[in-house]
């Protein structure tokens, strides 16, 4: 049987598992790998290859890096390769009709959500941030829209309490690769009839911005915890020390200013790596059981951002509903620490507050 000629388009780490799976399968021949041009990264801003380019070179595959996928010479080069199928996984550019119509079996895309939910740039993060308990991968036949093509196959996976965006990303990447290898033969043989995406349930997963990671202590603890998991490792869930806790003030990015105020906040940012939701006061939260605490806080977390207790078990912070126990955190310019390690070197007192 003649191997299927495939052109693979991908850039991000999410793409690598699929490229590896295709390259290691004798049913498929990778005619070319298309990825984004090398981009400046790191402190020295030296051009760095994409994860897909690095993998393709290790596999001995030809690599193309057009600045624009719409470039006519680039498209002519793809046409000359006579692909049977194009596979797209997190490539990063919208493909013109001239590419979509090029292979005889069309273009298949792997999207890390259960389409039509979470079309767009950041489906993994927003599924976690919104507290979803299930997500998955979708293989669709691409059309001119943004993640709107008919569904060829899907596979589901639970979002576990211990998941963050990094662990879920890796699981979905592997799940997508496995599903792709299983789907391609049936798709090419005409055994699968792609199903149009339903209009009901469609949503958009916007690109993550740095400011999305800032903690709003007015939100319920569960919401903050979900967002913490969603925005780990980037941009991270972060907050700022109050003036009383920091002692000095200086300018910070515009997105970090208090709502309704132009006053610059202290520059020392605290990144929270690990936390847990507290719904009831336990015996170990002794500071919460003081008589004055009951008088000041009729229910747990009445004052958002307030330090309710701080000991070796964690730093408990009041939220709009319930509270959050911080277990691991990192001060700007410092290293990641447990709460006990952090408190050994920083003075944080009950009654003080993080900035809301």
Each PLM stretch: what is its role?
Residues 10, 33, 56, 86, ...:
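A residue-level signal for conserved active-site and pocket-lining positions in enzyme catalytic cores
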Residues 5-7, 31-33, 58, 62-81, ...:
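Internal alpha/beta domain cores that form substrate/cofactor-binding pockets in large enzymes
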Residues 85-211:
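Donor/substrate-binding cores of folate-linked one-carbon enzymes
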Residues 1-44:
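N-terminal Rossmann-like dinucleotide-binding module
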Residues 39-59:
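N-terminal beta-loop-helix "entrance" segment that forms/cooperates
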Residues 218-244, 258-284, 288-289, 295-356:
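An anion-binding loop in the catalytic cleft
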Residues 25, 102, 231:
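Acidic-histidine catalytic/liganding microenvironments
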């Amino acid at each position: 049987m003649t191997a299927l000629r495939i052109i693979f388009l991908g850039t991000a780490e999410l793409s690598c598992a699929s490229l590896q799976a295709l390259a290691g399968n004798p049913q498929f021949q990778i005619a070319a790998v298309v990825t984004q041009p090398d981009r400046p990264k790191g402190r020295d801003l030296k051009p760095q290859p994409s994860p897909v380019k690095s993998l393709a070179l290790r596999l001995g595959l030809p690599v193309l890096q057009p600045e624009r996928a719409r470039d006519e010479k680039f498209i002519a080069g793809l046409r000359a390769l006579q692909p049977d199928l194009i596979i797209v996984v997190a490539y990063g550019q919208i493909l013109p009709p001239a590419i979509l119509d090029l292979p005889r079996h069309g273009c298949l895309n792997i999207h890390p959500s259960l389409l039509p939910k979470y079309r767009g740039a950041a489906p993994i993060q927003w599924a976690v941030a919104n507290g979803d308990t299930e997500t998955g991968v979708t293989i669709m036949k691409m059309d001119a829209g943004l993640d709107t093509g008919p569904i060829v196959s899907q596979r589901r996976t639970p979002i576990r309490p211990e998941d963050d965006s990094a662990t879920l990303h890796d699981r979905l990447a592997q799940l997508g690769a496995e599903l792709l290898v299983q789907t391609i033969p049936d798709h090419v043989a005409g055994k699968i009839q792609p199903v149009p995406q339903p209009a009901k349930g469609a949503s958009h997963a916007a690109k993550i911005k740095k400011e999305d990671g800032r903690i709003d202590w007015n939100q319920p603890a569960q919401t903050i915890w979900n967002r913490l998991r969603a925005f780990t490792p980037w941009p991270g869930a972060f907050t700022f020390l109050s003036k009383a806790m920091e002692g000095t003030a200086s300018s910070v990015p515009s997105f970090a200013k208090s709502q309704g105020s132009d006053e610059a906040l202290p520059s020392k940012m605290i990144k929270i790596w690990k936390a847990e939701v507290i719904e009831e006061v336990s015996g170990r939260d002794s500071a919460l059981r003081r008589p004055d605490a009951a008088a000041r806080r009729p229910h747990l977390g009445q004052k958002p951002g307030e330090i309710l207790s701080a000991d070796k078990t964690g730093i408990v912070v009041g939220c709009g509903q319930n509270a959050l126990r911080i277990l691991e955190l990192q001060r700007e310019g410092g290293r990641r620490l447990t709460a006990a390690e952090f408190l050994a070197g920083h003075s944080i007192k009950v009654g003080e507050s993080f900035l809301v």
